[in-house]
């Protein structure tokens, strides 16, 4: 979704953006010009946003005996589970309303005002009104193109079976084709069932490594702490309970385990990423849904 970049060895990626909305006074629209007449010179207002690497990481361990005796190999299963679970964590962080900082990017709903959902009498009327409410700000901003719906799969199922009083299912074929009102749909269980989200993906920019970086060690020492999971919903392990083995004051973390001494193996995954919206107000949120 959106425009994707790669950090490579760059510590920051600067992406130009337009400061003024389209059709604002002083924009760069062309004008009809008569023969021999001077062509107008207009000035636009442009700025930039920056993408900087935010590191996701996790470590998991297993014993030497498990490595030697498991079929299929436990390391492969752990790598697969890390990728699956991290994908869910990324979706959760992407779709929340938490502000960004030096540790993590801001969620798409950060700073977005929630539009109250419709209280119409039928499900079809509620769905139609909620979609219209989500779309209206984009129409006002002349930006009602390259949009994508974000919905929970359970809501997509309900839309398929929502019918009019005469037995017509207006959304069934659309959902089956992967769109609503001609706009593509992304279904994710990380979208709350009470939410309908609409994003202008043309303004969504991101940088994510093509593949996670995995490293193996059997000699490291680790502080065995899960970083506050599952209560650390902000995904900021740095603000939770994972500690240096020995801090600046000489205080040792606990519990600490030596992989070499316990004949164990650790798998570490690292993944750099960042995302942002190039223009403000290019995300709308309707909630709480009543269908």
Q: Residue ranges of each PLM-predicted region?
A:
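Sequence/fold signature of self-assembling virion shell proteins
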Residues: 76, 80-83, 163-291
């Amino acid at each position: 979704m959106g425009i994707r970049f790669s950090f490579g060895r760059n510590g920051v990626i600067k992406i130009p953006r337009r400061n003024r909305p389209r059709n604002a006074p002083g924009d760069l629209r062309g004008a009809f010009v008569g023969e021999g007449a001077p062509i107008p010179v207009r000035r636009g207002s442009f700025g930039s946003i920056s993408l900087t690497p935010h590191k996701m990481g996790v470590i998991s361990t297993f014993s030497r005996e498990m490595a030697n005796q498991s079929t299929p190999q436990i390391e492969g299963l752990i790598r697969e589970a890390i990728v699956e679970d991290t994908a869910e964590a990324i979706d959760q962080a992407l779709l929340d309303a938490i502000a960004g900082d030096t540790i993590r990017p801001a969620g798409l709903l950060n700073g977005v005002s929630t539009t109250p959902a419709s209280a119409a009498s039928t499900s079809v009327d509620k769905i139609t009104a909620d979609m219209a409410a989500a779309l209206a700000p984009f129409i006002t901003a002349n930006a009602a193109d390259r949009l994508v719906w974000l919905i929970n799969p359970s809501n997509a199922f309900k839309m398929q079976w929502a019918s009019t009083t005469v037995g017509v299912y207006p959304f069934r074929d659309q959902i089956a084709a992967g769109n609503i009102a001609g706009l593509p749909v992304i279904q994710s269980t990380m979208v709350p069932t009470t939410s309908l989200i609409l994003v202008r993906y043309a303004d969504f920019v991101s940088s994510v490594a093509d593949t996670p970086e995995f490293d193996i060690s059997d000699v490291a020492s680790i502080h065995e702490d899960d970083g506050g999971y599952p209560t650390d919903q902000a995904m900021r392990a740095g603000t939770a309970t994972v500690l240096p083995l020995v801090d600046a004051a000489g205080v040792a973390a606990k519990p600490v385990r030596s992989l070499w001494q316990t004949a164990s193996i650790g798998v570490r995954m690292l993944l750099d990423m960042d995302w942002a919206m190039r223009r403000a107000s290019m995300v709308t949120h309707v909630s709480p849904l009543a269908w």
